[in-house]
A protein has these predicted regions:
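Cap/insert and terminal regions of metallo-dependent hydrolase folds
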Residues: 15-17, 128, 239-317
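C-terminal motif of bacterial Sec signal peptides marking the signal peptidase cleavage site
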Residues: 10-12
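Histidine-centered catalytic micro-motifs
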Residues: 151-161, 224-231, 292-299
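Active-site metal-binding motif and surrounding structural segment of the metallo-beta-lactamase
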Residues: 105, 113, 128-179
Length: 317
């Protein structure tokens, strides 16, 4: 893998449901308190259902709610080919609903000096995601779209790039450079259904090679292909503190984590996606790396722990 994480190689949803957050915390033992350097900022008292403030070392960060997706436990989207009863048992053991898999959609905002970074942009108004709350979440965070300087895209799926354009087709973030891997951009350019989006954002796009350091000392791309050919995770660093932005490495806080070998319908290279998922979860668990999971129960902050031959998600709240 191209990126070193602590000396180890590193190689993808309904209105919020109360039991989502409870289940996330209850899937394992009680989560350990965050280190002082990761404690919420003084602005945490202003947190609400759509904006959750926290710290990455000296950096201010905000989890931004955009929407939710419900996927039925029918073996057609998640846990492809697995008996639904087996999936239901896994969900029940974690205190999660057994007939449906709830996924959140939450882009990440990070303030890094004069730069304001946004990681993915949500789904916008697509019906299946019940998204489009990102503009309101940004307002709650006190950030105007024009103030975003850099956008880091994990991959080209609608629930990650849907917020790049405003309803009128104009750039939603007119002053932002849009960073994504060269492979992922090539895939977008070749997709006829993405033609309008590609045309609109092309002047703003800056591509990178796998594992590139994008903002020295702050943001590094993590090789994580498989879900899509150019999918990237991101490692955000401030001093000794780090946060791993997962993208779509793992979709569900129980199924994707406790059974990383189970795939989802949207993994374009399922065997590679399974391997990358296990590699990334293993390294994050071994190193105790703090994780931001885009689709886990809001706000998606926590860590992975090894449990037997698999893993478990330990949420911070």
């Amino acid at each position: 893998m191209a990126l070193l994480l602590a000396g180890a190689m590193l190689p993808g949803c309904s209105r919020p449901q109360p039991d989502d957050a409870n289940a996330a915390a209850g899937a394992t033992a009680e989560p350990a308190p965050a280190a002082a350097g990761n404690a919420p900022s003084e602005g945490a008292r202003e947190n609400n259902a759509d904006a959750f403030r926290f710290r990455i070392g000296a950096l201010d960060a905000v989890a931004l709610k955009d929407g939710d997706v419900d996927a039925p436990n029918d073996g057609k989207t998640f846990a492809i080919g697995q008996p639904t009863e087996q999936v239901a048992a896994l969900l029940a053991a974690a205190g999660a609903p057994t007939d449906v898999l709830h996924l959140s959609i939450q882009p990440l905002l990070v303030r890094a000096g004069e730069r304001v970074l946004l990681f993915d942009t949500g789904a916008s108004d697509v019906e299946w995601a019940r998204g489009g709350r990102l503009p309101a979440s940004l307002r709650a965070a006190g950030v105007a779209p024009s103030g975003i300087t850099d956008i880091f895209i994990s991959h080209r799926h609608q629930d990650h790039v849907g917020g790049l354009l405003a309803p009128d087709g104009a750039l939603a973030f007119p002053n932002a450079t849009i960073h994504l891997s060269a492979t992922e951009w090539a895939g977008m350019e070749a997709d006829a259904e993405a033609a309008a989006l590609v045309s609109a954002i092309a002047p703003k796009v800056a591509t990178f090679e796998p594992g590139a350091e994008l903002i020295p000392g702050t943001v590094t791309a993590v090789v994580d292909d498989g879900h899509t050919p150019g999918h990237s995770a991101y490692l955000i660093t401030s001093g000794d503190d780090r946060l791993l932005y997962l993208g779509d490495t793992a979709h569900h806080f129980v199924v994707s984590v406790q059974r990383p070998e189970w795939t989802v319908a949207y993994d374009m290279d399922a065997p590679l996606a399974q391997r990358r998922r296990r590699e990334l979860l293993q390294r994050a668990a071994d190193d105790g790396t703090r994780v931001y999971a885009v689709h886990f129960p809001f706000p998606g902050l926590g860590r992975f722990e090894t449990q037997g031959e698999s893993f478990v998600w330990v949420a911070e709240r």
